[in-house]
Amino acid sequence: HLSIRRQRQMCIRDRRNEAQRKAMEESRLGIPILFGYDVIHGFRTIYPISLGQACSWNPQLVEQACAVAAQEARMSGVDWTFSPMIDVARDGRWGRVAEGYGEDPYTNAVFGVASIKGYQGEDMSDSKRVAACLKHYIGYGASEAGRDYVYTEISNQTLWDTYIPPYEAGVKAGAATLMSSFNDISGTPGSANHYTMTEILKNRWKHDGFVVSDWSAVPQLIDQGHAADRKEAARLAFNAGLEMDMMGHCYDRHMAKLVEEGKISMQLVDDAVKRVLLSLIHISEPTRPERI
């Protein structure tokens, strides 16, 4: 007989495949769903936390562990992991220190690249690989007094000397996506920061993937005093270079009106759509609703 765990896994698989089938066969445009999940330090098989992995100074072993995690995740229907976290963190009071590779930019860069290679391999559409997501772009670990979601004071020199190097290495290693950070950077929130998401990431580094917000980070622009309402939050985030609003429901509710009013250009919308669709093609096999 099948174990309860196996039955549950099959049920999740079947629901996932049915959702994918409907998206591809019954929706207007037939665009497949991209299934993302926090595969942080293993999936079915659990490995040491990222901070512990860094202590090994064995990036080859971390690459192997991420490859196993990718295979296990893909077998369960996951296409995309929200990992690795490469936030340089130097305040032990911050509650997410354990998710990253420590206080050194170079160490974060080396292990971040190893993780990307393990997750993505040579071909992300391989049934044993998943897309990686560098997070949290950028300066999330610099929060004052170890408090989460708060203000950070980062000079341009510190940004480039300390916080940029892991992300630059990760982008050059081929990371498919990035996730914007909750914090602001010297007054400008990470999810509405044109300098980091467009001027650096897209224009300077020529990254051709997309940026996704952290969970509900776009409406958080209101709490940060940066936007008056969700509509303005959508405008600020999208125009700054944030292609995907994760669970904020600002884009789906206000994007059409913003375009109609001329506050968001169709050229920018086309570029964002192209980035997401090309990523889908690289990550999955769009002609197949079933990946398992």
Each predicted region: which residue ranges?
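Short "domain-exit" segments at the C-terminal end of structured domains
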Residues: 2, 285-292
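Glycoside hydrolase catalytic-domain context in secreted enzymes
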Residues: 6-9, 13-285
